């Protein structure tokens, strides 16, 4: 019989606090020392690999709703010298929860309290995140009364860890509700993608003068790009994504260090959200993309010894995705992808065609990935491919992947419509 006991059962909490500096800015302290978060949002990621790239902190979205339970994540993080901003899942109004239902709100409060009591003394704990993007499609500001009640409770039983909630975008209505109804929060957390470069302007104009984190940032969001005439979002390539990571960090985080007390890049892992490559920094098969190179440089000042391939957009019979390309059933077409490998590695290619996702979920809710349609591409391992348009009319997407044999990859895709 083996007995597994979480560190939180006997460990000593490490005090974390936010202090105001002489210059008017803010500083996160851990154990009385300045703590610079080099963070990533994870769900099921290899934390040892993450630390090897220079990260020192992770954030989660729930206690036990992810791949690994909180106790396991905290213990693993602690063994690696990492910290965890722990998510307390909160029900969302857009999914049917009523924040005027006192019984349901009280039940949620007690669940949060039980989790706080369970994990508050874990040495890897850094901050508490109450809910995620509770402002998404919200109409009832009472949600922030519930957030405040939990924040007050946490401060009473756990004075060692600051408390926040995360906001999708820069939402003035949510900001007003938080200021009016949730004064117990220690800081606010924002989650923006392409628009993150405008966050300093939004903060200044609102105005908000307190400390904040940016707890999701990275790729350009699927709602922020050009849509084809049939409504398919045009995804950036892995190289374009990497450039956006660098730009976002420089303009929204590094330049705003007086108010930004930390950040968590999204997503150290992979997920299906409109496509399987849109937000993850890894492919489903595990290969690293160029965004990982950028994050290692941001975290350590050093590029990896072996870099990822770089790609440009797919060309389909001389056209690009912004051309709203229509194909005819069963007709033959060609596509190609230009690639450059910084290390002159021998690269291999993989192409596939899938139906366009019909997902309409918002806020990161789970989505179904359409399967690969086999037999349409003549030689899916070539740099330039010939393929047959599907025999069924509708929206599709052509995907291309480039692998360098060293665990690195690049990707691009091209939406098209068959008629």
Question: How would you label these PLM feature ranges?
Answer:
Residues 22, 30-31, 37, 204-366, ...:
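Substrate-binding clefts and catalytic carboxylate motifs of secreted carbohydrate-active enzymes
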Residues 22-23, 29-185, 208, 361, ...:
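Active-site mouth of glycoside hydrolases
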Residues 1-6:
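Bacterial N-terminal signal peptides
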Residues 412-418:
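C-terminal edge beta-strand
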Residues 388-393, 406:
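Short, surface-exposed loop/turn segments at beta-strand-coil junctions that are enriched for proline
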Residues 7-11:
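Sec/Tat signal peptide C-region and signal peptidase I cleavage site
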Residues 144-249:
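Noncatalytic carbohydrate-binding groove/subsite architecture in carbohydrate-active enzymes
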């Amino acid at each position: 019989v083996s007995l597994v006991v979480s560190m939180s059962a006997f460990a000593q909490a490490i005090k974390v606090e936010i202090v105001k500096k002489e210059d008017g800015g803010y500083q996160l302290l851990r154990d009385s020392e300045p703590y610079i978060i080099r963070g990533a949002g994870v769900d099921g990621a290899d934390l040892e690999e993450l630390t090897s790239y220079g990260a020192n902190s992770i954030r989660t979205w729930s206690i036990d709703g992810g791949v690994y339970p909180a106790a396991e994540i905290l213990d693993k993080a602690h063994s690696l010298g990492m910290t965890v901003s722990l998510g307390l899942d909160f029900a969302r109004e857009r999914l049917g929860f009523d924040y005027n239902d006192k019984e349901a709100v009280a039940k949620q409060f007690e669940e949060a309290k039980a989790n706080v009591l369970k994990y508050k003394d874990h040495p890897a704990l850094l901050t508490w995140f109450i809910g995620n993007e509770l402002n998404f499609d919200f109409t009832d500001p009472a949600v922030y009364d519930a957030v405040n009640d939990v924040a007050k409770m946490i401060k009473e039983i756990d004075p060692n860890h600051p408390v926040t909630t995360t906001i999708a975008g820069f939402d003035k209505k949510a900001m007003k509700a938080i200021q009016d109804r949730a004064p117990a929060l220690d800081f606010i957390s924002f989650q923006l993608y392409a628009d993150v470069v405008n966050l300093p302007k939004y903060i200044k104009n609102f105005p908000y003068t307190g400390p904040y984190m940016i707890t999701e940032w990275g790729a350009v969001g699927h709602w922020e790009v050009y849509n084809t005439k049939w409504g398919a979002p045009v995804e950036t390539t892995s190289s374009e994504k990497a450039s956006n990571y660098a730009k976002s960090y420089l303009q929204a985080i590094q330049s705003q260090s007086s108010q930004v007390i930390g950040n968590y890049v999204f997503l150290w892992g992979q997920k299906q959200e409109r496509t399987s490559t849109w937000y993850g920094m890894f492919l489903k098969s595990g290969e690293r993309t160029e965004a990982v190179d950028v994050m290692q440089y941001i975290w350590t000042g050093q590029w990896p010894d072996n870099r990822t391939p770089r790609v440009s957009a797919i060309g389909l019979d001389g056209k690009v995705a912004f051309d709203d390309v229509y194909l005819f059933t069963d007709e033959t077409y060609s596509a190609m992808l230009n690639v450059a490998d910084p290390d002159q590695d021998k690269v291999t290619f993989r192409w596939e065609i899938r139906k366009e996702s019909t997902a309409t979920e918002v806020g990161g809710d789970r989505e179904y990935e359409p399967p690969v349609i086999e037999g349409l591409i003549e030689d899916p391992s070539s740099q330039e491919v010939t393929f047959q348009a599907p025999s069924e009319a509708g929206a599709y997407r052509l995907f291309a992947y480039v692998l360098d044999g060293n665990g690195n990859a690049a990707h691009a895709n091209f939406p098209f419509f068959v008629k």
